[in-house]
Amino acid sequence: MGDNYSTYLLDIEGTVCPISFVKETLFPYFTNKVPQLVQQDTRDSPVSNILSQFHIDNKEQLQAHILELVAKDVKDPILKQLQGYVWAHGYESGQIKAPVYADAIDFIKRKKRVFIYSSGSVKAQKLLFGYVQDPNAPAHDSLDLNSYIDGYFDINTSGKKTETQSYANILRDIGAKASEVLFLSDNPLELDAAAGVGIATGLASRPGNAPVPDGQKYQVYKNFETL
């Protein structure tokens, strides 16, 4: 089913790891840190340059604005940058490990060309794949899958995931023909956008994913073992 492709483009949440990981682990970890980040911000702090880009001087208003962006899941590039900074500390301190599916780990290791495309920043993507919970080891052990991944794309490098032009940009950047690429995601709007430039698509059907209307029109993958 997936043997006809030389290149694979993968979504993250709901595709290679549970969709709940972001909303139940990453987002709460970030929002719990926001008050401290804002209240302790100084000109010399590492986050000062990021927070200043919001152009909100009042700390209470700034905190409320950031939390509102998170609550509404707004794909704001400044927010993504701030989240990347906070999550880096979480991963590096061992407080966060990414629960990547075992079949996805095996898939990434055995395929020659694998690229990642997520609305999360490239920095956040590299952190996630750098601190993967090892399914065959104790809870404190982690895997670094970054050496198996050929490249990363986000909304800043390529555009929104629901826009066809974004996938044309990715094809250009990786030097591949559309017919050589299979894109896997749990979001049908993203699949339709990729199909607009001729990329083959597959709908990831993982536990906890939202039901997809007209799902029968997509090639469905419950895991990556058949690829």
Curated annotation (Swiss-Prot):
InterPro entries: Enolase-ppase_E1, ENOPH1_eukaryotes, HAD-like_sf, HAD_sf. One of its GO terms (molecular function) is magnesium ion binding. Its cofactor is Mg(2+). The keyword ATP-binding does not apply. It is found in: Cytoplasm; Nucleus. GO terms for cellular component: cytoplasm; nucleus. Pfam families: Hydrolase. Its EC number is 3.1.3.77. Keywords: Amino-acid biosynthesis, Cytoplasm, Hydrolase, Magnesium, Metal-binding, Methionine biosynthesis, Nucleus. Present with 2850 molecules/cell in log phase SD medium. Bifunctional enzyme that catalyzes the enolization of 2,3-diketo-5-methylthiopentyl-1-phosphate (DK-MTP-1-P) into the intermediate 2-hydroxy-3-keto-5-methylthiopentenyl-1-phosphate (HK-MTPenyl-1-P), which is then dephosphorylated to form the acireductone 1,2-dihydroxy-3-keto-5-methylthiopentene (DHK-MTPene). Belongs to the HAD-like hydrolase superfamily. MasA/MtnC family. NCBIfam families: enolase-ppase. This is Enolase-phosphatase E1. It comes from Saccharomyces cerevisiae (strain ATCC 204508 / S288c). The lineage of its organism: Eukaryota, Fungi, Dikarya, Ascomycota, Saccharomycotina.
